[in-house]
Structure formats: structure tokens, C-alpha cells
Amino acid sequence: MLNIMKKTTAAIALLCLGSALAWGQAAQPQWKDRAEFDLFELIRKEQNPQAKLQLLQQWEQKYPQTDFKDGRYELMVQTYQQLGKAKEMLDTAKAWVASNPKAITGWYWINLLTVSINDTSPAALDQGEKAAKALLEQIEEALSPAKKPAQVTDEQWNQQKATMEYVAYRTLGWVALERQQYLDADKYFVEALKRNPNDAQVSAWAGRANVRTKQLERQGIALFHFARAAAHSGPGAFPEQARQQLMSSFEKNYINFHGSKDGMDEVLKLAQTAAVPPEGFKIESQDEIMAKQEEELKKSNPVLALWVGIKRELTGPNGASYFENSLKNAHIPGPDGIPVGETTVKKLKGTVVSADPPKRPKKLVLGLSSPNMSEVTLVFENPLAAAPEPGTELEFAGVVTEYSLEPFNVTFEVEPGDVSGLPAPKKAAPAVKKAPAAVKKK
């Protein structure tokens, strides 16, 4: 729980150095008496964190008001950290900012602890949001160029500013995520990743936030963030086992969303080098791909496009409802036809797969999407005079009566006059006329 806080020691030390020098430039702090100084020296030299904590508590009891109150709070937070007591760290940091609202390091600790303690109660989330906003408000003043210590480089100072901003945006994103404010969460997580691209946990949170928007256009962005969380290695990465699990999950979800592995390697390659998706980044969904293909099909083959649309609806999650409400007992494509793009389709077209019975059939099975697929059964009231050969193309219209999903098939009741391409009945051979009998001579 405290791993992320252990990584901030150097950053906090740099901030405190700047703060300490700023105090020195303003007003030199003074000890109340020699006893206070001696107590501080004991605290400074004590290596045992439990003993140090007891000395700090003595200092607090004996000298509640001191010029070194900020330093004392800081030492108490660090000592509780050594003891692994996160709640006490948070309580101390809260008391610190209550005593000094401009104690930027106190606000910083509250940000870190809000997320790591994982208290999602409304009060804790409110506290985290307040701490993050307070931190952002104070950064410009606390880390202005004028306050940079001489021994600190411009690069170090700017990095410290970016680190503080990253922590604040990370907290705001986490709070928004827990409040189910998913668009806000994504916005804050992106700002955090711009300042610290190595935080795989933030990438995973950003993926979760985008998924939970339930907006189609954000699902591809979610996949990018999950790819980043799985692909990132080095500082800030997940452990290897967790990365493997994330990668398996990413691959499965990518295929489910996109319909195939096409483009997946390119997404992973991009995610290895970038923490946030570039402007205009998009992964097309299966539905978007199919819709695009259908639009093209409407122009090139409107009859097939009509059938593909019907079949997609019937095989979808609401197929039974679609059949009952839109197809059952309906004449398809109808006496006036169905508009498809700029064309009105008045008959569907298929290829004969089989006839039942083979001679004088009452049923013909057709493939519409492909000549070999048994997708439609045409049912005639009376046997046909002749059976069409397999491979024969027919155009038809009729009344839909039933359908099955496994195997997929739609049944149409048709009249011979509504079917084009049926073979003409074979004409009977003309009767052979017998030659007239010869007249017998008398």
C-alpha cells in the first residue's frame, strides 16, 4: 500500500529544502528554550522509529506552539511511514494542513494517502478532491522560479513541479472514477500520464473509466490504455504476472470489439512508446466495420445488402423479437419493394442448394450470402412441375413464416409466380399419328 509513497522521498526532500530556505529568507525560526532544542536533537539522532515517535509526541505535548511546527509534522508523517501506519500518516497530514493551509507537503501526503488507503466513502473522496485542488492551487507559488534554491537545477525544479501536478491529477482521476464520473476521470488520468507516462496503474484506471462510459467511440481508447498497462515495462510497470494477465485480457477484448486481430500489433507497438493515444486515435468496432461494408454493398449489390441486414438482425441478441415484430407473416420484400440505398429491391436472389423431393419438389433450399449456404427454404403449396438444378439462380418474394438460429434458416411461403428462374415444365412429346390403314382392293 505504501510503495508509491516510498518512491517520493527524494521529491519531498527537494520540496522541503526549498521551503526551509524560504523560511530562512523570511524570518529565522527560534527555539522556545534550550530544552526544546535538546529534545529535537534526541529526535534527530534516534534511529528506532517507535522511540522516535514517542519523542515527537513528547515534543508536541510540551511545546504545542513552536516555530518548527511544520518540520515536526513532517517528521511525524515520515516516522509513521517507517512504522507502516498509513491511517496515522493521513491523520497527521490533515492536522498539518489544518494548522497551516499553505503546507504544500501536507497536501501532497493527503493526495498520496487518499488513493493508497483506498477509502471510497463520500467523506474520504471529498477530502481527496479538496487536497488535490489545494495542491494544484499552491504549486505555482511554492515552486516559482524565485523560490528555487541555488543548489537545485532548473530541470530538477521543473520536474518537482510536474511530479506534484501528476500526483494531484492522479488523485482527481481516482476520485472521479470512484464517483462514477467517468469522462472527468479520463480527463484527469490523461493529465497525470502526460506528467508521468510510466504509471501503468493510471493507464489501467483510464482504460476502466473509458469502458464504463459505455460510449462506442471511447471503447477503442480504453483498449489503448489497457494495451499500455500491459505493454509498459520498467519503472512504474505492473509485475510480470499481472502484465501477462493484462495482455491476455487486452487481446481477448480487442478481438471481441474489432472482430479480428487486424491492427492489434500496431496498437501494442504504439502503446509501448506513448502513454496517451494520439489525436484522432480510433479502433473500429465490428459493427462499424460491418456498417461500412453494408454501405458499400448497398451500392454494389443492394439485393445482397438487404439480406445481410435481415440476417444480422435475426442472429443478433434481439433476433426473436425482430422476427416476431418485423418479419413473421410479412411479405418480403413486399409488393412495393424495400428501398436499399438508391435502389428499390422487389425480389431477393439466391442459388439453389437442394430440392425436396428431388423431383416435383415442394421445397427449395437456397443460399443467399453464398451459393453453398442453406439459408432460405422456399415452400410451395403444390409440387413444382420440374425441379431446378443445384446452382440455379432464383429471384423470389414471399411470406416469412418461421426461422431457426441453429442451423440458421428462414422459411418463405411462395407462389410460383413470385419466383423467377424456375425451369419450365417439360412439354409432353407430341402423339405419333398412325398412318391411315391401306384401302383393300376389291
What are these regions (language model features)?
Residues M264-K442:
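OB-fold and OB-like single-stranded nucleic-acid-recognition modules
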Residues E46, L83, I117-P122, R179, ...:
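Structural motif corresponding to the intra-repeat A-B loop/turn of tetratricopeptide repeats
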Residues A22-L75:
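N-terminal leader/linker segments that initiate helical-solenoid repeat arrays
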Residues K62-G71, A98-I104, E141-T163, A192-D199, ...:
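Short solvent-exposed coil/turn linkers within tandem alpha-helical repeat scaffolds
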Residues E46, Y80, T114-S116, A176, ...:
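Residue at a conserved register position within TPR or TPR-like alpha-solenoid repeats
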Residues V115, D126-E140, V211-A237, Q272:
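TPR/TPR-like (Sel1-like) alpha-helical repeat modules
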